[in-house]
A protein has these predicted regions:
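A residue-level marker of the well-folded mature domains of exported/periplasmic proteins
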Residues: 22-23, 27, 35-389
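C-terminal motif of bacterial Sec signal peptides marking the signal peptidase cleavage site
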Residues: 16-19
């Protein structure tokens, strides 16, 4: 995953450093300044080494991030995207700031627009907006602020030259996770998703997970069970209700649950810890967050954000502006984390072989963004208990 667009990013980073000249970023401690006291350049590779908040010399912030619902530090979608913003800014001497729409998980389109306007008023030349719920507000803002570039993560083309839609083939990494855990030996699975069954990315994750489990079970001549729920996930938040539901699953025999929805992971991991269950993480490698994590269905959020921002500064924005870019196995933008591999019956070599089959087209994964209920998908080796949302 870290090799995603690596050569391209290396090139645009060099070009951007030349273009940016002597621009610097400063916070109170100087941690995000790319020039040290001897004038040497620091190259950041770990976003955790970069402050979330920085103070620019002129009070303006050139690169902005507008969060999706949920927490900034959700160890998932918001944080993964913001990591790319921080890395590009810090490594190129640019100021950056994040903006959270008012009213939290009850944020309206007006709240999201206000956050984008605040970013523009604060000096933003490029605004990275996370989540499909940003669409209406983003279109309004982009039409009004035509000199500002907008990167729409998990988005689509809005027919505007200053908007780049960046989406992922989540069904592919979801498939890898479902296939892997069944091959590992798990037969009683769960899925709990964010967005109430309306979020296209979460739907693709879950539908891919079910397809992967089905294909693995078919190869093993067995049938597996899958609890499938959109309950308590509309706001992508952790909640006692979600933890109670998933605890009930574990106590009734469910072995592993795919936690697909930002901070919802916290509730699922807590339930797993209490009930001796296991978890599949989402968006980023979440193995460091809980010992219950077996694997994670990942997409290259940080790399994609860096790549898209770079195009603002290297003069190639026209390649992605007024277009929808979809990233998947062909770009090495989705997958499972091999550096923290813990599975024993399904090896890294097995995974790499599976990845290659998908890449070559030997395995076709349906990407229906409306398949919120996999019980309607014609699966032959998965018994789906659909709970809805």
């Amino acid at each position: 995953m870290k090799k995603f667009f690596a050569l391209l990013l290396a090139l645009v980073m060099v070009l951007s450093l030349v273009a940016c000249g002597d621009r610097k970023t400063d916070d109170n401690q100087g941690d995000t300044n790319t020039d040290d006291q001897q004038g040497e350049t620091t190259t950041y590779t770990n976003p955790d080494d970069i402050d979330d908040n920085m103070t620019s010399e002129d009070g303006k912030y050139e690169i902005a991030f507008v969060t999706d619902v949920g927490q900034l530090k959700d160890k998932s979608f918001n944080q993964g995207t913001f990591d790319g913003v921080k890395l590009y800014a810090a490594n190129n001497g640019l100021s950056y700031k994040y903006y959270q729409p008012a009213n939290g998980d009850q944020a309206t389109d007006d709240d999201r627009y206000d956050a984008m306007k605040a970013a523009v008023d604060g000096g933003a030349k490029v605004i990275v907006c996370a989540g499909f719920m940003q669409g209406t507000a983003l279109e309004k803002a982009a039409k009004e602020f035509t000199d500002t570039k907008f990167v729409f993560i998990d988005g689509w083309s809005l027919g505007l030259d200053n908007v780049a839609g960046i989406a992922f083939n989540e069904e592919q990494c979801g498939y890898f996770a479902g296939y892997a855990v069944v091959k590992e030996g798990y037969e009683k699975l769960g899925f709990t998703g964010g967005g109430g069954g309306t979020n296209p990315a979460c739907i693709r994750y879950g539908w891919g997970f079910a397809q992967g489990a089905n294909d693995a079970a078919k190869e093993m001549d067995k049938t597996v069970d899958l609890n499938y729920s959109w309950e308590y996930g509309a706001s992508f938040q952790a909640s006692p209700e979600l933890q109670t539901m998933v605890s009930g699953w574990y106590s009734n025999g469910t072995e592993i649950v795919f936690a697909c929805g930002g901070s919802m992971f916290q509730s699922v991991a807590a339930a797993a810890s209490a009930e001796d269950g296991k978890v599949v993480g989402v968006d980023v490698d979440q193995s460091s967050e809980s010992e219950t994590v077996v694997t994670s269905a990942m997409k290259g959020l940080s790399d994609a954000a860096e790549w898209a921002i770079a195009k603002v500064y290297d003069g190639t924005w026209d390649e992605i502006g007024n277009a929808a870019t979809s990233l998947g196995v062909a770009e090495n933008a989705v997958g499972l984390p091999t550096a923290t591999w813990s599975m024993e019956n399904f090896s890294v070599a097995d995974y790499e072989d599976l990845f290659q089959k998908v890449l070559n087209g030997d395995i076709t994964i349906d990407n229906n963004s409306e398949m919120a209920n996999p019980a309607e998908g014609g699966l032959t080796n998965v018994n789906v208990n659909y709970i809805g949302g």
